[in-house]
Amino acid sequence: MYDSNAYNDDIPYVIRQNDRKFVIIPYSFDTNDMRFDGNNGFIQGDDFNTYCKESFNQLLSETDDGSLRMMSIGLHPRIIGRPGRIKGLEDFIKHIKTYQNVWIPTRIDIAKHCLEKDLFNFF
């Protein structure tokens, strides 16, 4: 039904594979907890929160004309679930929940929605 191993776009898109529709849900490394691992990334939970908030706020501002946007966040329990990091994620979720027209789906929910609504067909 879907694949999320693409890095070539910011929004999902539908392709045809073996006469069936297949949703590509792009993955992102910048809003990803893997940036805690290594020397060039996040250090504190608030670093993650701040970066995600700024990304979210920018994407939200780009919807003023009716455009659709998606923000993909890669999370790994062994990384974001650490005591010094989880609060950054919790604070970010609190921030986005203050907005009325924001949907927080799983990838399978995104794929089903794209197929049901016939969104983003590029074939």
Map each language-model feature to its residues:
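Active-site-adjacent pocket scaffolds in enzyme catalytic domains
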Residues: 1-67, 123
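C-terminal domain-boundary segment and adjacent tail
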Residues: 53-123
